[in-house]
Every structure is written in C-alpha cells, then in structure tokens.
C-alpha cells in the first residue's frame, strides 16, 4: 500500500469528520442554508456519491465526477452559476469540467443552497437527508418523494416527477439497482443514513 494511497484515505476520512461537525453546527435559516453548512454537506454528499473520486463514472447513466452530476444537471448549473466558463467551450468541454474537484464542490454547494430554499418554500423539511435527496433525485424527484405515500414505489415516484417524460422506472433501476425494491419510506431513511453521523465513508453505489 503506497504512502500516497494512505494519505488519500486519511484525507477523505478527515474531510468526512469535519463535514459532520460543520453541518451539525450550521444553521438552517428560513429560506436559506448558510454557506459553511452547504459546503460541509457537499463533503458528505461527495463521500456518499463517489468516495471522493473526481474521475468516478456510472456505467448505467451519465453521472460523472466526485458529486456524480448528470450531463443535463451539470450543463444547466454551470450555465446558471458560472457563465464565465462557457465561452469558448463546447458542451463536451463543459462536461469535462466535472473532473475539477473544486469546481464540482462550488457548483454542488450552490445547488444545495437552492434546494434548501425550494424545500422551505414548499413547506418541506430541510435536513441533511432531504437535501441529499434533492441532489440524488433532482428537485422534482425530492418534492415527490418527500410528499409521497411512505409505501409507494420510490423509483416510480421519481420517474413520474420528471416532467420531460424521459425518465422511466427501468432507467432509474438500471443506474441504481438498490432502488428496485425500495419504497418512498425506504429511500428517505436511506438518505438520512447516508448523511448521518457515524456513516462510514465508502462507495455504496454510483448514480
């Protein structure tokens, strides 16, 4: 085992522990989440999504990078928040930026703040778990899951929330096999566990 590998493992572990402390202490204020808490939560999301690997790729979907951003989500987010990066770049060039760990963290933190405001506006809980659901399932998917019947099929609820009609239960399960038998209640508990204190860093799945 190389010294570089050991250093990476230690760094990931320290980042995870630090993120728990920061997010625990960060306040969720009305329609927003403070920037420190958003950044702290992003560290936990990254551990859950890819174990911190900026080159992670899901073979079943377009999810790429440390935060496992889908193509459409990343393109929209960069165009909205970092227009300075668009000039002179093709869509492929913009998508390749998902390999930039710091940019990924910046974009993810901005989206966490947006998700918190959206959930608050809809009267839904703003917790580490609900914010992770918004990252994982998208805003529409998170709203549907947080508002849905506990016994409903989670993948069906997520697919139905996609207004474009491009998402199907089959596609979701192919990319996330653990969803096959999950109910809405199951996935909410899963998200809470993934973001909870004491969760062991490690790659459970890639979206």
Regions found by a protein language model. Give the residues of each.
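Catalytic and substrate-binding regions of cell-wall glycan-acting enzymes that process beta-1,4-linked
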Residues: 129-184
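Short, surface-exposed glycine/acidic/tryptophan-bearing loops
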Residues: 57-88, 151-156
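Alpha-helical segment that forms one wall of the substrate-binding/catalytic cleft
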Residues: 71, 75-132, 136-144
């Amino acid at each position: 085992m190389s010294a570089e590998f050991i250093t990476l493992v230690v760094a990931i572990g320290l980042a995870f522990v630090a993120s728990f402390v920061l997010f625990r202490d960060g306040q969720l204020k009305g329609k927003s989440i403070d920037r420190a808490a958003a950044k702290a939560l992003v560290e936990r999301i990254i551990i859950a999504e890819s174990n911190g690997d900026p080159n992670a790729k899901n073979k079943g979907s377009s999810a790429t990078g440390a935060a496992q951003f889908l193509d459409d989500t990343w393109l929209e987010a960069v165009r909205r928040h970092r227009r300075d990066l668009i000039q002179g770049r093709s869509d492929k060039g913009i998508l390749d930026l998902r390999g930039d760990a710091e940019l990924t963290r910046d974009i993810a933190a901005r989206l966490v703040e947006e998700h918190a405001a959206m959930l608050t506006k809809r009267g839904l809980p703003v917790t580490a778990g609900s914010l992770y659901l918004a990252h994982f399932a998208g805003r529409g998917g998170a709203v549907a899951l947080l508002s849905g019947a506990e016994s409903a099929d989670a993948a069906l609820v997520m697919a139905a929330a996609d207004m474009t009609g491009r998402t199907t239960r089959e596609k979701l399960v192919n990319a996330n096999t653990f969803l096959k038998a999950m109910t809405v209640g199951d996935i909410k508990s899963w998200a809470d566990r993934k973001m909870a204190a004491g969760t062991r860093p490690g790659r459970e799945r890639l979206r």
